[in-house]
């Protein structure tokens, strides 16, 4: 009720369209909105509401569900390869009291394929108070989380639907996010916004009823995100904690960080422009009392140190306000974990952390140098005449070249399996491309009659799977489900490959008479992270050393033992270089820029990797160049591929010496105070999220939808447009003008056939029937 009907000031408005009037939809769209709340009612209501919320916050963590005594997280590993998990959990348990008092910053650098997912959960479980249990968010370094990825995580940890929430999808686009913020600002009703992006889905079957959550929102997705003991999501789902400027989008992720710990999976996979936002998230995690774990085999020193400094700055604020000893100096419990050894040390400042981290990395590098070599790579030269070719012809020639490299790799005995039933030789390989745009043309070119030389016709059968991030989410999830099954090579022996006994693969081998079968995934960079796949070999169009190392982790991932020869071919450069030779080639993805000192003088890997590989024809691909600085600590970012990455990270994440200018996009602006006696406290303002945009995308985009026709037999493309009323959507048919199906004749190759056979209409029908 209005406290004073005659109060002259109003706080907000509401749209005419909300009136219960059958004629409201016919009213002029430009008509003035109705005044809603008087200012006195609004302010007194906010005060009462905020008081109740603030009084409930201290007990929130103790009241929410937690994971207690989960046996799979305590079970000792029977496999010697995963014994490091037991040692890591034991070490974490031994320092849990220190971590509870002073915070914890954990670095897990175990090699790809060593079971970091389960290891991370076991470490965080060991750190948690046994009396209250584990509450933790696992944030993946992906833009979009498919249900298939979430279910794999759930199965790895043996969690029920009452113990884990899976936030499927990606965060809203920047344009859509800003549009609704502007709409809320225009009406003064920002507090009425939904707390989560409407496009996402949170799958959780547990108890999400808590008085505070009921008061904050009636959004079941927000309840689940906050209440679930364990949450698996993308970093995009948590960054609104620091990136939202209006409304309530920050509330749910803030409360998630306030009531649990944080694991960042593959944090070094982010674009350089997104590292400031990642730094802000880690700073806030420290400020709200979370313990943080970074998990990646390719963590560069500057990134680890920069995120530690951000966490320390946040933790110092937390300690001043919520610690039992607020005047005590900050001393964070730090842990370093990998498959070789584990270490812990209290670090009061950046210098102590840097020294301890450097010492640990040196030990790791020494172990990597002694380890068995499972991935051997060589550089493949590219034709000089590509510079003068038309782009379409160059892409066709690229398709022929990578198929030739794939055939050469397949022929090595260590890169294929022999089917005992038929004597056919079978391999599963990956051709990684740097960008999606040329991938479509390259895939079509592989179906051309001349894609394989005449002498291989009738001898070689290519089974081609195209896989990238721009598929409709349901279709991408279906492809991933099949790849996850087929590329699980656990239990493989010299005379036994589990892949050959999968019914889907078996049927394809038996239905084609050729003696050689190459199952090829032609994929974008999405193939590098988040997928537990084991390939026999890989052909790589390069982007960065980081991506090369991550991709190498998908080759012989499940099969220990030294490889008998080369199983990776890295092209000497990429297609972007031949399209624009004077422009940066290793960007988007990559670390090169147009500005010195971060523009490379050469785009040929035989120049950029000369120091690393010397005169060797083949070299071992592992994490050494990414995790360690050069022995002389001198970086030449314009001449060396790995130095470029280290220099970019150092420039963005670490504070500059006093007296030098700090770049506008420096990640350290969130926490670094050049003059502590006069702090700027930029993190208390909304300036940085405006000038250092997360997932900045200036390209204009349209929303489109595939809708079934009247007979529900065909999907037709429509453009999604805003209607007259708020939230109204119009679907404008554009199928005839913008959708160009590939003629069946263009895919009728004598040697190449599509694999797997996945149809969106069939997947939709199956999903509808299942629900």
Predicted regions and their residues:
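SF2 helicase catalytic motif II
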Residues: 236-239, 250-288
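Conserved interdomain linker/interface between the two RecA-like ATPase lobes of SF2 helicase motors
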Residues: 294, 304-308, 313-439
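Conserved C-terminal RecA-like helicase domain
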Residues: 83-98, 102, 111-114, 128-130, ...
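Walker A/P-loop
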Residues: 100-124, 266, 270-273, 296
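Conserved SF2 helicase motif VI
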Residues: 545-568
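The feature captures the C-terminal accessory region of ATP-dependent helicases
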Residues: 390-424, 428, 434-457, 461, ...
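Walker A/P-loop NTP-binding motif
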Residues: 115-134, 151-154, 281-284, 311
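N-terminal accessory nucleic-acid engagement/regulatory domains that precede
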Residues: 1-75, 156
């Amino acid at each position: 009720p209005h406290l004073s009907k005659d109060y002259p000031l109003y706080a907000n408005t509401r749209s005419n369209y909300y009136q219960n009037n059958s004629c409201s939809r016919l009213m002029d769209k430009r008509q003035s909105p109705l005044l809603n709340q008087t200012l006195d009612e609004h302010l007194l209501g906010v005060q009462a509401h905020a008081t109740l919320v603030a009084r409930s916050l201290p007990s929130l963590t103790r009241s929410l569900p937690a994971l207690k005594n989960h046996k799979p997280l305590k079970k000792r590993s029977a496999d010697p390869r995963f014994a490091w998990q037991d040692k890591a959990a034991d070490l974490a348990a031994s320092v849990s009291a220190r971590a509870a008092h002073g915070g914890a910053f954990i670095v897990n650098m175990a090699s790809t394929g060593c079971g970091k997912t389960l290891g991370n959960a076991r470490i965080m479980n060991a750190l948690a108070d046994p009396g209250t249990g584990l509450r933790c968010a696992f944030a993946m370094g992906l833009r979009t989380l498919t249900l298939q990825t979430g279910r794999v995580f759930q199965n790895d940890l043996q969690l029920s639907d009452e113990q884990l929430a899976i936030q499927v999808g990606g965060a809203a686009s920047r344009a859509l996010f800003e549009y609704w913020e502007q709409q809320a600002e225009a009406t003064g009703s920002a507090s009425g916004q939904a707390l989560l992006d409407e496009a996402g889905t949170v799958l959780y079957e547990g108890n999400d009823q808590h008085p505070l959550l009921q008061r904050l929102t009636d959004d079941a997705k927000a309840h689940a995100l906050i209440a679930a003991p364990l949450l698996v999501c993308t970093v995009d789902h948590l960054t609104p904690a620091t990136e939202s400027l209006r409304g309530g989008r920050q509330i749910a992720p803030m409360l998630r960080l306030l009531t649990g710990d944080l694991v960042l999976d593959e944090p070094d996979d982010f674009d350089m422009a997104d590292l400031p936002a990642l730094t802000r998230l880690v700073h806030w995690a420290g400020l709200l009392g979370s313990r943080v774990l970074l998990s990646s085999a390719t963590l560069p020193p500057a990134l680890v140190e920069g995120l530690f400094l951000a966490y320390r700055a946040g933790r110092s604020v937390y300690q001043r306000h919520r610690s039992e000893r607020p005047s005590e100096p900050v001393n964070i419990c730090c842990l370093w974990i990998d498959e070789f050894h584990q270490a812990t040390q209290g670090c009061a400042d950046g210098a102590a952390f840097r020294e301890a981290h450097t010492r640990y990395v040196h030990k790791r590098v020494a172990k990597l140098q002694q380890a068995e070599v499972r991935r051997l790579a060589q550089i493949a030269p590219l034709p000089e005449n590509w510079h003068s070719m038309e782009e379409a012809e160059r892409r066709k020639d690229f398709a022929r070249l990578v198929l030739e490299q794939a055939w050469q790799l397949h022929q090595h005995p260590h890169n294929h399996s022999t089917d005992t039933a038929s004597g056919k030789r079978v391999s599963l390989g990956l051709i990684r491309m740097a960008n999606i745009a040329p991938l479509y043309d390259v895939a079509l070119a592989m179906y051309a009659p001349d894609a394989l030389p005449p002498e291989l016709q009738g001898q070689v059968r290519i089974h081609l799977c195209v896989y990238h991030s721009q598929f409709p989410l349901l279709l991408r999830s279906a492809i991933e489900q099949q790849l996850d099954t087929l590329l699980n090579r656990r239990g493989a022996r010299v005379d036994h490959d589990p892949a050959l006994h999968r019914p889907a693969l078996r049927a394809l081998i038996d239905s084609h008479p050729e003696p050689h079968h190459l199952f090829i995934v032609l994929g974008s960079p999405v193939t590098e992270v988040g997928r537990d796949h084991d390939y026999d070999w890989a052909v790589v169009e390069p982007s960065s050393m980081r991506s090369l190392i991550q991709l190498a982790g998908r080759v012989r991932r499940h099969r220990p033992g030294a490889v008998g020869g080369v199983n990776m071919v890295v092209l000497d450069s990429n297609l972007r270089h031949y399209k624009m030779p004077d422009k940066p080639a290793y960007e988007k993805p990559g670390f090169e820029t147009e500005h010195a000192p971060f523009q490379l003088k050469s785009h040929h890997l035989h120049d950029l990797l000369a120091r690393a590989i010397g005169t060797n024809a083949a070299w071992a691909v592992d994490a050494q160049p990414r995790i360690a600085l050069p022995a002389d600590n001198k970086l030449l970012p314009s001449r060396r591929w790995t130095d470029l990455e280290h220099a970019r990270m150092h420039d963005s994440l670490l504070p500059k010496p006093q007296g030098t200018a700090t770049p506008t996009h420096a990640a350290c602006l969130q926490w670094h105070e050049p003059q502590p006696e006069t702090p700027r406290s930029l993190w208390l303002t909304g300036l940085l999220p405006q000038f250092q945009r997360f997932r900045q995308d200036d390209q204009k985009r349209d929303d489109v939808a595939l809708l079934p026709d009247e007979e529900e037999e065909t999907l037709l493309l429509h453009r999604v447009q805003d209607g007259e009323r708020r939230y109204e959507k119009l679907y404008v048919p554009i199928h005839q003008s913008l959708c160009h199906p590939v003629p069946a004749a263009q895919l009728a190759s004598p040697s190449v056939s599509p694999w797997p056979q996945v149809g969106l209409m069939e997947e939709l029908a199956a999903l509808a029937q299942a629900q």
